[in-house]
């Protein structure tokens, strides 16, 4: 957005940290404003793709995640316009799949873990809270496990936020949750997950979730919105190391130039106009406005993408008739 008239921009040296106000009877603001430290003078970074994508680094990634000599098969698969490099690893029955902007590595053990964690609180089967009573497991403190994971991400050149969610996956809880998941699948007549049945302390692990960043800007993958988890990086770590590493939507960025940025107050005006045009009795509560780098167009043929700075607005929509059915909505404005 640098093409708007300059008087639209607030030339203040600092944006506020947040705001609490009522714009209208239906639009309430109790919001935190998030933006990088270096965005103080009403300017923000405009970025472009730089350096090596995950696809370019496939050999390094394979060496980092798989011990030498263990790759039993490797091939390239085309899916539509996207190419995937696939490595099969016999030793722990793992696969590693790499495209331009995604990396998915998982062992057999990881699939058992994934079968017993339901981390989306929108759904009835949510059980993430069960894994958050403890901080540490006997095999290693959580902090140390995250430090080890961070070192691997650093070697991959992937920057992530310190804003990390950790599920402490303790074997006795996983055993119980597996029984429930199987019972639920039988009841609903859906595919029954392969059961591990025997869970021991060797299965204890940490399940970390976070998101990619660039110089403190969250970097948002192209597909976002309802039902999409903003955490595009997840890692399962146990006493044998990384059992699963998933990065969905990673783009190596560099600074293109500094651009004037619309203030959070201007964004609130835009939100007021946006919701003012919707005919509804819902109540909108603006909770957070964050300055992000958003991937808007991906060109798989050229292994490239377009990036632009955006304000992401997180709004709680409360239904006036049934307050229980409130939901979060994310709305994006050009910065």
Where are these regions (language model features)?
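Segments that shape or occlude catalytic/ligand-binding pockets
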Residues: 148, 152-234, 239-323
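C-terminal soluble interaction/assembly domains
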Residues: 322-335
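Glycine-rich, flexible loop segments associated with nucleotide phosphate handling
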Residues: 134-141, 304-309, 326-329
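Preferential activation on post-signal-peptide N-terminal prodomains/segments
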Residues: 3-224
């Amino acid at each position: 957005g640098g093409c708007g008239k300059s008087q639209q921009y607030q030339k203040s040296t600092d944006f506020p940290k947040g705001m609490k106000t009522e714009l209208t009877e239906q639009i309430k603001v109790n919001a935190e404003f998030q933006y990088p430290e270096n965005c103080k003078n009403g300017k923000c970074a405009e970025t472009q793709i730089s350096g090596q994508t995950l696809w370019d680094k496939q050999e390094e990634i394979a060496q980092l995640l798989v011990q030498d000599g263990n790759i039993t098969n490797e091939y390239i698969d085309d899916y539509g316009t996207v190419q995937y490099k696939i490595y099969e690893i016999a030793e722990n029955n793992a696969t590693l799949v790499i495209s331009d902007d995604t990396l998915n590595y998982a062992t057999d053990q990881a699939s058992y873990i994934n079968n017993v964690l339901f981390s989306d609180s929108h759904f009835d089967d949510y059980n993430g809270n069960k894994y958050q009573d403890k901080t540490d497991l006997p095999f290693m403190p959580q902090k140390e496990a995250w430090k080890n994971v961070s070192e691997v991400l650093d070697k991959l050149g992937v920057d992530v936020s310190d804003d990390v969610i950790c599920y402490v996956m303790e074997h006795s809880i996983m055993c119980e949750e597996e029984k429930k998941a199987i019972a639920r699948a039988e009841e609903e007549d859906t595919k029954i997950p392969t059961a591990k049945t025997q869970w021991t302390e060797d299965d204890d692990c940490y399940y970390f979730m976070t998101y990619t960043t660039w110089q403190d800007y969250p970097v948002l993958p192209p597909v976002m919105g309802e039902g999409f988890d903003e955490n595009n990086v997840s890692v399962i770590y146990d006493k044998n190391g990384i059992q699963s590493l998933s990065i969905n939507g990673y783009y190596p960025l560099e600074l293109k130039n500094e651009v004037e940025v619309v203030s959070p107050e201007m964004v609130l005006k835009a939100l007021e106009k946006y919701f003012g045009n919707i005919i509804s009795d819902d109540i909108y509560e603006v909770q957070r406005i964050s300055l992000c780098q958003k991937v808007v167009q991906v060109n798989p043929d050229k292994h490239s993408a377009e990036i632009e700075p955006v304000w992401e607005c997180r709004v709680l929509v409360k239904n006036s008739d049934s307050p229980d059915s409130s939901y979060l909505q994310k709305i994006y404005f050009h910065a």
